[in-house]
Design a protein with these regions (language model features):
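Helix-biased detector of long, well-ordered alpha-helical tracts
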Residues: 1-179
Length: 179
């Protein structure tokens, strides 16, 4: 989510601080987490520059800092009347994956795996955010849901919007569930 927030501002992520508490005997979990963290950090050029660790119930806090040229940050408050509203990727897969994991819905094995992956390993669109710097008037990460997050953008920008829900890109798994 931190990387997606950076992407939504057109910022280049650079540094990370990780603070955490881990219980004794959590070595396998820590090894898997570390592999994932370093793979994602390496993919986006982020260096882990500090933090703190202690023993206790598992609790992690990751902070990412980055760079954007002065005056070039893309803010939620920049939308203007007449702007188009775009999304990247399909929406709803993480929510559907969580519902399947919690037993609130059923999915076939392939759809369950794909949607769970979108929940557990979201794809930050850092390159897209950088490419849209100077082009987009406003951006935000919609990981909290399209309706709520677009509402934040509209409120901050003092504009309204008409959203054609039929045009929102969805995965086949979500389309089948909605049918």
């Amino acid at each position: 989510v931190n990387l997606s927030d950076m992407a939504a501002m057109g910022a280049r992520p650079r540094w990370a601080l990780l603070a955490g508490a881990l219980p004794d005997g959590d070595d396998a979990w820590l090894a898997a987490f570390s592999r994932g963290l370093y793979a994602l950090a390496g993919e986006h050029g982020v260096e882990l520059v500090g933090g703190d660790t202690t023993r206790g119930p598992r609790n992690l806090c990751l902070t990412i800092a980055g760079e954007v040229p002065a005056g070039a940050a893309i803010l939620r408050s920049g939308a203007r009347a007449g702007d188009d509203l775009w999304v990247s990727g399909t929406l709803g897969d993480a929510m559907l994956g969580l519902a399947a994991i919690e037993g609130r819905t059923s999915l076939d094995a392939a759809a369950r795996a794909a949607c769970a992956a979108r929940l557990e390993r979201p794809t930050p669109r850092v390159a897209l955010g950088l490419a849209l710097r100077g082009v987009a008037s406003a951006m935000l990460d919609v990981s909290d849901g399209l309706t709520g997050d677009v509402g934040h953008l509209l409120e901050r920008s003092s504009v309204g919007a008409v959203v054609d829900l039929a045009a929102v890109p969805r995965s086949g798994a979500l389309d089948r569930k909605l049918a």
